[in-house]
C-alpha cells in the first residue's frame, strides 16, 4: 500500500499539472534543502520567480491577446515525450508496479545535483526527466523569441532572466549536457499567433516550474 505522505505528493504533482493556481502550490509545506540538492533547489526557486515575473509582464503587455488562464487553450508540449510526474514518484511508490513510470528517459550522470555519489536510481530518473522538460521548453522559447524579435511593433520579448534561469538549472542537472539547438522556423512568422502561443507556453511552463520546485524541495528533505 502506498504511504500517506507519498500519496499526498503524487496528488500534489498531478494537481499542479492540471491547474494554474500558484497560490495553492505555495500553501503546501516547504522543506529545508539538504546539502546534495541545495544548488538545484536554489535554481528551481529562481526559475519559478523568473517565469512568474515573465508571465505577469506578458499578461499586462498582451492584455488584448487572451492571455489569462481562463482564456487560453492549455497545452503541454512535453506530453507523450517525458513523464516527470511518474518519474518523480517517491521510491516507496515506484516499487509498486502500478506506480512505475511508463516512458523511457535518458539518464543524466554528471549533474551537480548528483554530487553526493549516493543518488538513487529513482532520483536520477526524476532529475533526468526534469532536465528533458527544461530542454524542450528552452528550445521552444528560443524559437519564439527569434520570431518576436522580427516583429516591427517590438511589442514584447522574452525576459532573458527566465532563459538564463532555465539554462542554469539545466547546467546544474547535467553539466555535460549538450547545447540546446535552435529550433528552425521554415514559415513566415504570424506575430499574432506567436504572441498567443507565448501566453499558452508561459502558463504551461509556470505550472511545470511549480512542480519542479516542489519536487526539488521534496528530494532535498528525503
UniProtKB/Swiss-Prot annotation:
Citing just one GO molecular function, the answer is: growth factor activity
Keyword Nucleotidyltransferase assigned to the entry: answer is no
Provide a GO biological process annotation: immune response
Glycosylation sites recorded in the entry for this protein: 96, 174
A Pfam family reported for this protein in Swiss-Prot or TrEMBL: IL12
Swiss-Prot/TrEMBL keywords: Cytokine, Disulfide bond, Glycoprotein, Growth factor, Secreted, Signal
* Self-association state and partner proteins as the record states: Heterodimer with IL12B; disulfide-linked. This heterodimer is known as interleukin IL-12. Heterodimer with EBI3/IL27B; not disulfide-linked. This heterodimer is known as interleukin IL-35. Interacts with NBR1; this interaction promotes IL-12 secretion.
Query: PANTHER family per the record?
Result: INTERLEUKIN-12 SUBUNIT ALPHA, INTERLEUKIN-12 SUBUNIT BETA-RELATED
Q: What name goes with this protein? A: Interleukin-12 subunit alpha
- Record the organism: Lama glama
Give the encoding gene's name.
Answer: IL12A
Amino acid at each position: 500500500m502506498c504511504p500517506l505522505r507519498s500519496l499526498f505528493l503524487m496528488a500534489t504533482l498531478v494537481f499542479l499539472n492540471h491547474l494554474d493556481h500558484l497560490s495553492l502550490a505555495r500553501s503546501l509545506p516547504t522543506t529545508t534543502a539538504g546539502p546534495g540538492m541545495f544548488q538545484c533547489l536554489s535554481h528551481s526557486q529562481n526559475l519559478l520567480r523568473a517565469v512568474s515575473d515573465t508571465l505577469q509582464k506578458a499578461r499586462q503587455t498582451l492584455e488584448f491577446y487572451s492571455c489569462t488562464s481562463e482564456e487560453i487553450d492549455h497545452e503541454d508540449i512535453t506530453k507523450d515525450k517525458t513523464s516527470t510526474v511518474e518519474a518523480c514518484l517517491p521510491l516507496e511508490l515506484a516499487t509498486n508496479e502500478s506506480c512505475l513510470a511508463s516512458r523511457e528517459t535518458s539518464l543524466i550522470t554528471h549533474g551537480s545535483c548528483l554530487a553526493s555519489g549516493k543518488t538513487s536510481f529513482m532520483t536520477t530518473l526524476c532529475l533526468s526527466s526534469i532536465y528533458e522538460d527544461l530542454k524542450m521548453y528552452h528550445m521552444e522559447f528560443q524559437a519564439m523569441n527569434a520570431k518576436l524579435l522580427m516583429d516591427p511593433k517590438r511589442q514584447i520579448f522574452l525576459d532573458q532572466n527566465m532563459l538564463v534561469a532555465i539554462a542554469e538549472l539545466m547546467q546544474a542537472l547535467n553539466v555535460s549536457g549538450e547545447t540546446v539547438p535552435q529550433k528552425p522556423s521554415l514559415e513566415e512568422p504570424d506575430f499574432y499567433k506567436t504572441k498567443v502561443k507565448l501566453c499558452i507556453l508561459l502558463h504551461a511552463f509556470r505550472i511545470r516550474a511549480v512542480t519542479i520546485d516542489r519536487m526539488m524541495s521534496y528530494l532535498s528533505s528525503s
